[in-house]
Amino acid sequence: MSDSLHFTYAKPAMCVGGFSPERLKQTQDAGFSFVEVGFSELAAKTESQIDEYLAVLNQYSLTPVAANGFFPSTLGAFFDGSFDIGKTREYIARAFETTRKIHFESISFGSGFMRRVPDGYDRDRAKDFFVGLLTDEVVPMLEKYDARLNIEELQESETNFINTCREAADIARAVNHPRVGVLCDFYHMTKSGETAADVAGFAPYVGHVHLASPTSSRAVPLPGDGDDEAYRAFFKALAQSGYDRRFSIEGGVASGRDFAGTLKESYTYLTGLFAPYESEKV
């Protein structure tokens, strides 16, 4: 294996938005040190509430490094006539200020409900709006608070705009800023027909990765879940592309399974798959 084929962060983080203290303790016990939190969820809290939350994470030696859920549903949709740029601008500024104590290596911009394009709406116009919103309203906050935002592709059942990593990369390319990239979600990517063979086409823009099993109804990755070969090919393609950022598990635990045991099994499984590409910095 070439020395160049390594992951800078070869230990997965866990998405813990909405987790109780008990679940956070189980996350720690499973082996996790890093977590991904809910951005809009935290943005709705007071500063003292965020301090309390960070204290709980610290109690379990969990470091927040990423966030998902950039926009809350209360802001409405971009293209249905209800969009209020003033209200959105106010939210963005307040959200970054409220969460300023967390250094976000990645904030994912999914929000499929907001970006759905109505029938008959010009797609080029939608893209121009999206690029303008990121460039004019979001990038200044990313610079001010030393954060990165990654555009998440979502399968067609969740939205009809930006359904592939390639499309997300087109947006990131148009924004043309080092703090804006692509969140490559293995689950959505697979559901949208992209494979490891497609990674090279958008790899330069990938700033974060989400993992869940497409075969097992978006569950956390596990041995024997039917996706092992696809995981291995995906990780190899990322390593060959020079990917050097984090991975987060964004999957659930099937009903009837032991949560703590399943989480530990997933962590052990993924760290084993990462092992050929592991570097000293984790």
Model feature map: region roles:
Residues 1-9, 13, 20-31, 89, ...:
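Histidine-acidic metal/acid-base catalytic patches
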Residues 73-79, 115-121, 157-158, 191-192, ...:
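A short acidic, helix-capping loop that chelates divalent metal ions and anchors anionic groups
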Residues 26, 30-48, 68-76:
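N-terminal substrate-binding region of glycoside hydrolase catalytic domains
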Residues 43-45, 127-129, 159-163, 184-194, ...:
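Active-site glycine- and acidic-residue-rich loops that bind
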Residues 18-20, 39-41, 70-73, 113-115, ...:
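Active-site-proximal loop/turn and secondary-structure-junction residues that shape catalytic pockets
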Residues 36-57, 111, 118:
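Glycine-rich, proline-tolerant flexible connector loops at the mouths of alpha/beta enzymes
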Residues 3, 79-181, 261, 280-281:
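Active-site acidic/histidine proton-transfer and metal-coordination neighborhood
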